[in-house]
Amino acid sequence: MSRQTDMDPGTYVPDIGGLRFWDMWKEVVFVFVNDTKQKHGGGSETGAGAFFPQYSKYPAMAARSKTKFLGELLILSRFHKYNPVFTTFAGDRTISTAFVFQQTALCVLAAYLFCGAGMVWNDWIDRDIDAKVARTKHRPLAMGSVTTTEAMVWMTLQVIMSWGVLRVMLDNKDVLKHLIPVMVASVLYPFGKRYLARKLMIYPQYILAFTIAWPAIPGRAAICGRHESFTETTRQCLPLCIMVFFWTIYLNTAYSYQDVVDDRKLKVNSFYNIAGNHIHVLLVLLVSPIILAQFDPKQPASGGTLHKSNFILGVWTILACAAEVFLTSA
């Protein structure tokens, strides 16, 4: 089956062929659970211990149900929270709104799945460290409620699904060029927290910032990629990627500071180590260029735009706080 786009009349983009990734995943889980249970002869034991007897000595695993297990996988990929997934789209006005929304949905899905896989990889590499940090000790791998084998299977499924969606979104054009850079960065990210990386003045925020800024490129390619080269797409997205790169360094430096006490005990590498006791000054220096860049003295109207963005930020902050209060009270 094919679908026609408004990008170029008469040209077809391969459809996903009726495949529904969620249905496929449910089928995989069903077959996996039943096959494993049959291999171990079923039995009266319930939960993970019924078909993973070797893990019965771990209470978190032995007591879990199938529903709990699936829930742990979702938590492992942070699907129960917001994710730092960044996508962007650009194109002339001759492109239909329906096509843009279609590509947007595919791009968000691909990025969300890949981000989830990256979370699993990070937690697998850091599982021993996470177990010693107050904020992260309850993560599934750190507390032992999910095995490393299960985590790797889950991660692989997410990567495969993300790759499949990306192929459809990009009409199978330059897929590896879009995927490999962010995949390599995702693999390297947790190792940026190690002591050796600090010696080399490599901080995990550099690597993470790249992985969050890069999706701007496949995002634009989803709309304009059929009419421009990969090099041109990258060139057009470069200013935006640079902005997101530095913004993410600021954002994640502030975020990771939550773990400063435990991280310093464990000698975990992070960008805030540069600042020492002057972390607030560092954060101000990081964010100031982005804010100042919004004002152009040659364009007086930019002052109004800056004021408007500040107002929108205030409204957004109020709504976010209200939502958090509501969710907390609920």
UniProtKB/Swiss-Prot annotation:
Molecular function per GO: transferase activity, transferring alkyl or aryl (other than methyl) groups
Pfam families: UbiA (PF01040)
Biotech use: Diterpenoid pyrones display various biological activities and FDDP E shows anti-HIV activity. FDDP D and FDDP E show also inhibitory activity of 42-mer-amyloid beta aggregation that is involved in the pathogenesis of Alzheimer's disease.
Name of the protein described by the UniProt record: Polyprenyl transferase dpfgC
Organism: Gibberella zeae (strain ATCC MYA-4620 / CBS 123657 / FGSC 9075 / NRRL 31084 / PH-1)
Main localization, broad class: membrane
Upper classification of the organism: Eukaryota, Fungi, Dikarya, Ascomycota, Pezizomycotina
Signal peptide: none
Protein family: Belongs to the UbiA prenyltransferase family.
Cofactor requirement: Mg(2+)
Protein topology in the membrane: Multi-pass membrane protein
EC number: 2.5.1.-
Gene: dpfgC
Domain of life, source organism: Eukaryota
Keywords: Glycoprotein, Membrane, Transferase, Transmembrane, Transmembrane helix
Reported function: Polyprenyl transferase; part of the gene cluster that mediates the biosynthesis of diterpenoid pyrones. The first step of the pathway is the synthesis of the alpha-pyrone moiety by the polyketide synthase dpfgA via condensation of one acetyl-CoA starter unit with 3 malonyl-CoA units and 2 methylations. The alpha-pyrone is then combined with geranylgeranyl pyrophosphate (GGPP) formed by the GGPP synthase dpfgD through the action of the prenyltransferase dpfgC to yield a linear alpha-pyrone diterpenoid.
CDD domains documented for this protein: PT_UbiA_COQ2 (cd13959)
Pathway this chain belongs to: Secondary metabolite biosynthesis; terpenoid biosynthesis
Segments traversing the membrane: 105-125, 146-166, 175-192, 199-219, 237-257, 273-293, 310-330
Glycosylation (residues): N34
GO biological process, one term: terpenoid biosynthetic process
